[in-house]
Amino acid sequence: MWFQLKIEHCPNDKIEEITEELEEYGALSITLTDKNDNPVLEPEPGTTPLWPEVIIHALFAQAEEAQYVREQLVAKTPSLHCSLEPLADKNWERAWMDDFRPQRFGNRLWVCPTWLPPPEPDAVNLMLDPGLAFGTGTHATTSLCLTWLEQADLKNKSVIDYGCGSGILSLAAIKLGAKHVYAVDIDNQALQATQNNAHANHITESQLSISSPEALQNPVHLIIANILLAPLISLKERFHQLLPSGAHLVTSGILEEQAPLLIDAYDSAFTHIATEYCEGWSLLVFTSK
């Protein structure tokens, strides 16, 4: 049995402070979700979640421990609404499985959970077991990226998936014809999740390299980066070094109203050629100058 502390009505400027306190109190896991559509939020270090209504879930092994933390948080920030819920082991570990169903992107790409048969066996099927910490393709930014990849000509192309998470974009690119993909992330859990999903899809080392971003050296035909605005801006020069003139950069992970900021920030190194929107999120396509 586990005990989940659900924290609502948390001011955005307090989220980082409260998550740090939860870590100090010994929370086994901390998850941030958007109250409106419940995507998993994977913020870069030092960044603050963008959504106006963020829910924090913290998991504890003992009810008394969770109750103590609840009391301490409310005493310090009275506006917080904290509720406590017991979770059976199976519910904590795989509660999301019931909601993860096969999804189609474009005309031929399916993302399917590893525990269900693909609806169209002859289609391009990506079998995914994302684990607890990473997305499944349901969030708008991942959906935008998968749909773009499905229609792109990736045959014999080299690709960098920057901020690979579960590896969903890396594996999709390989399934759709990419010759080699470099999946990079600053989170070791993400690298392990990508490795596990590559194994489930019979992807070999000749097709996929998994590493931290520092290992990137060779120029590629395409970079796809589904990360937040601040790291996207800070990585402009790095991306430009890895992309020869005319090569493509695809970015997502940014809100619709943030798109002009990124376009302006990239103007000296990249030409903006296309934009797609979905549920308030944007995907931007650039070519390297």
Curated annotation (Swiss-Prot):
InterPro entries: Ribosomal_L11_MeTrfase_PrmA (IPR050078), Ribosomal_PrmA_MeTrfase (IPR004498), SAM-dependent_MTases_sf (IPR029063). One of its GO terms (molecular function) is protein-lysine N-methyltransferase activity. Its main location: cytoplasm. Its EC number is 2.1.1.-. Keywords: Cytoplasm, Methyltransferase, S-adenosyl-L-methionine, Transferase. It is found in: Cytoplasm. It is an enzyme of class 2 (transferase). Transmembrane segments: none annotated. It comes from the Bacteria. GO terms for biological process: methylation. It catalyses: L-lysyl-[protein] + 3 S-adenosyl-L-methionine = N(6),N(6),N(6)-trimethyl-L-lysyl-[protein] + 3 S-adenosyl-L-homocysteine + 3 H(+). S-adenosyl-L-methionine binds at T142, G163, D185, N226. One of its GO terms (cellular component) is cytosol. Belongs to the methyltransferase superfamily. PrmA family. Methylates ribosomal protein L11. This is Ribosomal protein L11 methyltransferase. It comes from Legionella pneumophila (strain Corby).
